[in-house]
Each structure stands twice: as C-alpha cells, then as structure tokens.
Amino acid sequence: ILHSGQPLVLGAFTITPLASRHFQFPDPEMVATMLTDAEIPEPLVPPVSAFDYKLGEAWVLHVSHPKGSFLIVGSAGFIPGQLAGMDVDVVFLGVGGIGSQTADYRMQFWSETVGRISPERIIPIHWDSLTGPLDGPMTGEIRIAGFLSRGADETLAFLKARAAENSAVTLQTLPRFEEVILFP
C-alpha cells in the first residue's frame, strides 16, 4: 500500500509516491462516468466496456538511484506547488487528453510539472489510445481513444515549443520494443 510522501527503498532505488490529481476531463459525461465512484465492485472479466474501468487515484512517482533520478507524472493533472524543489533528471510526462484542454491549463500544467523540476529530458507518456495492436499504430476506435488523441498535433506542438524555450531540456519519445538506458 502506498502512502503519499513515504519513500520505499528497493535495493539502490528509492521510490517516493505522491498522491496527485487526475487530468480533469472537460466533458461532464466522462467525469461522471470515469472519475465519480471510482470503485470497481467486482473483478472485471474482459471483454468489457472501457467505461467499466475506473480511474481511481492518480500518483506521481519520484525514483532516485545513484546514477540519476526520474519522475513519472502519469496523468496530466497536478497539485500546485507539489513538485517544487525536487531533484529530477528525466520526467515521464503524462499528456493524455491535454490537447483537449485550454491553452491556460496546458501552460499551468507545464509550469507545475516541468517548470518546478527543471529536468534535462522530457519523455511524453500516456498519450496514445492504449487500445491499438502492439505491432501496429497505437490507435483505437473507442471513445476514450478519440479523446486521448484529440488535439494530438496541438499537444506535440505545445511540448516542442516549451522545450525549445530552454536549450537545457531535450524532448524525447521512447522507441517501441527497444531497450532504453536512461543513465549510462
């Protein structure tokens, strides 16, 4: 069981979970369906509707190791000031659905995540549909897929523009099915 702010030591790794906020869906129906009553009363046996799954809690994970540190911000939600002063080399930045948000929200999200931690590398995550085949393009035909990818061009342009403002930051995407070494 995770406790916000309580570090877990696993060998050379220290993992500190931080309770966070989930991305706020601008669509009231999606809020009601996915964020309200987030408990799943009994095990789900696929195939089931994507809306049978609930979002539950959102967490940020800070992982430190003698070779470097990284932060996993799984959702495009945030708690103002929460990440201030953290030492982070790489951030895995959850940006799913952020293209459907306002420009002000995107700027505030950037300021409260990347702006607070000043990482050397930003790796966007949680932006695909989560439903496409592993050997094909990551797309899907369900409603959530359309939502997550909505504004994808705008999201990518936003990330590139913000990263370009700071030459010390590199924006990188992960290759599929290839080993990635964060800290050589």
Predicted features along the sequence, with ranges:
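Core dinuclear metal-dependent hydrolase active-site scaffold
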Residues: 3-85, 176-184
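A conditional alpha-helix N-cap/helix-loop micro-motif detector
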Residues: 52-54, 103, 152
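Amphipathic coiled-coil/heptad-repeat helices and related helical stalk/stem segments
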Residues: 56-57, 106-107, 155
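Alpha-helical scaffolding within the catalytic cores
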Residues: 76-80, 106-112
